[in-house]
């Protein structure tokens, strides 16, 4: 992940192969891609904090490239001394010691360059990942409902690493190779301009087929990324609790094995193909270097016999030639390298340029303190489209739904007084969940207003609004962490006594005490080590720890055993006591106790009142009661008897 292409001039054939391979593997289709204006300026601005260390990096690379041309001259001088009529032992020993010292310095420089490049490379990754993650956290919930999680993770991982690699590889490669090629050519022309020109004529024999192999290799590499992504996606879906449970319940392990081995086989096959093309590339470079070396020794040997050149000069020319072809080939791909860096950074900047829809207003202020009054004032609402949440420009982020957004709430007006419980009832798709999401300002309304204690929530500071409104969703989400950490998510500074009080209020303290690790018990992925009732009660405990003035609750529809149901009901009673509450009701006990019931149908409030009054009216609520609640009433009577 850090500047692996440095020091090609001094790296020998092995080092050249790796760097040139990376350059040839770049996809030259990037030359035709559109890059947003100003991307290059922003790219260098991202690297601005590392100007000092980058300066040291360039100095070290330059020094290494200069040192890289010394040893061939030393070895040539040693050969000349040995081939002379009066060889000098002292001279040979001295030159050998100098060559050894140069090798030690070169090794030390390479270690220093690696450290510097790693510091810059990993620093860039850290900075970009942190900024992208922080920015994605600010995006509205509509952004997450319309995009695939894997695509977002790819932006955070692959694109960020790709941008860093393209930038650091390109910088190190261009600087190192340019210096190496310049110095090597100067020395070679000084030693023998005729042999140097002949050697350069051979270069196209390698470059032309190498470019074709490189293009094919870039296509194969891109295909391998896609196939690997498919295989990884299969593992991701099957290795989580839900996926594994589904496979077992439907008895499909053999089919899953066959499907996975098929994908893994494709990964294997394309890996072999990729390795062979890479080998062809390296073989072509090695063959060209060998042919050129043969020419140097042949032509130079003849000139040495004729007395036009010394034997050591021929040896030095052959050594320089090996160091020349790799950097020249890499420099021929500079345009692709630069465009790859720009395209990679542009994809990262696309995410950073997404404007969050839900932000603090310029005049944002805290929610007025005290018991909370909720007011929905002629609210109309439709969910935002993909374009409105700024996904249209992200071509690689799969948009799950591109259809036009139809209105879902019409002229919704109601008031909840301090301490009151209002139940939302209605058929599926009536708008109950939408109302529950508008109050904590997960979305903004198109017209009308929502007020808490007289303040329009669009003018409330988000931190204050979040502290005022507590939400318990139908499927309570728990992180793969300890019970303690999941609870402290609501209030990081809570004491053990406060945690115990919250657990007791949620009717789950006894269960936690029976666990071997108590509060430090890890709940598993999404809390799968806990039962449905236990997850609900932990979510309620988390709410109690937060202690909001307003509670928004979406009751779970899952059927619980009578003991768990009773515990959940007691926990809910504790959570709602003394708080202004808005509840999507699925339990008969909730609608019976509600101060007001709002009956929704197709986004409108069609009935409102108390349980007994609405039943007597014989409208939609009475019909829903017969469908949804009457069975619960019968069960309650049966249990009582």
Task: List the predicted regions and their residue ranges.
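Transmembrane helix-loop-helix hairpins at lipid-water interfaces of multipass membrane proteins
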Residues: 2-5, 54-112, 189-194, 294, ...
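Short intracellular "coupling" helices and adjacent cytoplasmic loop segments at the cytosolic face
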Residues: 24-31, 122, 130-154, 158-160, ...
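Transmembrane helices of ABC transporter permease
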Residues: 49, 53-66, 169-224, 296-309
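Cytoplasmic coupling helices
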Residues: 115-134, 148, 172-176, 199-241, ...
């Amino acid at each position: 992940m850090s500047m692996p292409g440095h020091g090609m001039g001094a790296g020998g054939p092995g080092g050249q192969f790796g760097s040139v391979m990376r350059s040839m593997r770049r996809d030259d289709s990037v030359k035709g891609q559109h890059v947003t204006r100003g991307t290059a300026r922003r790219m260098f601005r991202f690297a601005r904090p590392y100007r000092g260390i980058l300066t040291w990096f360039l100095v070290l690379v330059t020094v290494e490239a200069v040192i890289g041309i010394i040893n061939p001259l030393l070895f040539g001088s040693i050969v000349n001394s040995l081939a002379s009529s009066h060889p000098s032992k002292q001279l040979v020993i001295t030159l050998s010691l100098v060559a050894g010292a140069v090798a030690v310095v070169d090794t030390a420089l390479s270690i220093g360059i690696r450290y510097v490049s790693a510091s810059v490379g990993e620093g860039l990754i850290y900075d970009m990942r942190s900024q992208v993650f922080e920015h994605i956290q600010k995006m509205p919930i509509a952004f997450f409902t319309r995009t695939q999680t894997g695509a977002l993770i790819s932006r955070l991982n692959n694109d960020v690493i790709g941008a860093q690699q393209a930038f650091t590889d390109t910088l190190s490669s261009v600087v190192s190779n340019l210096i190496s090629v310049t110095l090597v050519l100067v020395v070679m022309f000084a030693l023998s301009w005729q042999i140097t020109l002949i050697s350069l004529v051979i270069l196209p024999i390698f470059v032309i087929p190498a470019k074709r192999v490189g293009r094919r290799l870039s296509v194969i590499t891109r295909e391998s990324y896609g196939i690997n992504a498919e295989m990884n996606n299969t593992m991701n879906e099957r290795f989580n609790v839900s996926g594994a449970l589904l496979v077992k319940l439907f008895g499909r392990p053999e089919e899953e094995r066959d499907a996975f081995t098929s994908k893994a086989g494709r990964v294997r096959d394309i890996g072999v193909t990729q390795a062979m093309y890479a080998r062809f590339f390296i073989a072509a470079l090695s063959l060209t270097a060998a042919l050129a070396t043969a020419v140097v020794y042949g032509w130079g040997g003849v000139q040495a016999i004729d007395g036009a050149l010394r034997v050591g000069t021929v040896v030095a020319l052959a050594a320089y030639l090996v160091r020349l072809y790799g950097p020249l080939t890499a420099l021929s791909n500079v345009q692709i390298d630069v465009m790859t860096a720009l395209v990679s950074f542009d994809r990262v900047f696309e995410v950073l340029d997404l404007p969050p829809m839900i932000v603090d207003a310029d005049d944002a202020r805290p929610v007025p303190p005290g018991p909370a009054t909720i007011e929905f004032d002629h609210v109309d609402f439709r969910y935002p489209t993909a374009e409105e949440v700024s996904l249209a420009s992200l071509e690689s982020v799969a948009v799950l739904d591109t259809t036009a957004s139809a209105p879902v709430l019409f002229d919704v007006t109601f008031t909840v007084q301090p301490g009151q419980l209002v139940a939302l009832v209605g058929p599926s798709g009536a708008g109950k969940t939408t109302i529950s999401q508008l109050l904590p300002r997960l979305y903004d309304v198109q017209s009308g207003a929502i007020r808490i204690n007289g303040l329009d929530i669009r003018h409330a500071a988000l931190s204050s609004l979040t502290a005022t409104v507590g939400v318990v969703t139908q499927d309570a989400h728990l992180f793969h962490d300890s019970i303690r950490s999941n609870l402290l998510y609501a209030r990081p500074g809570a004491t053990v006594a406060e945690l115990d009080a919250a657990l007791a209020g949620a009717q789950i303290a006894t269960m936690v005490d029976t666990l071997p690790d108590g509060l430090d018990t890890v709940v598993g992925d999404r809390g799968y080590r806990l039962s449905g009732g236990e997850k609900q009660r932990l979510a309620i405990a988390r709410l109690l720890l937060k202690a909001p003035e307003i509670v928004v609750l979406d009751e779970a529809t899952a059927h619980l055993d009578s003991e768990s149901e009773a515990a959940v009901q007691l926990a809910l009673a504790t959570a709602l006591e003394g708080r202004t509450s808005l509840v999507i009701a699925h339990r008969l006990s909730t609608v019976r106790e509600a101060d007001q019931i709002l009956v929704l149908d197709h986004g409108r409030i069609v009935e409102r009142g108390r349980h007994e009054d609405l039943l007597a009216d014989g409208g939609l609520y009475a019909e829903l009661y017969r469908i949804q609640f009457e069975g619960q009433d019968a069960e309650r009577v049966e249990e009582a008897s």
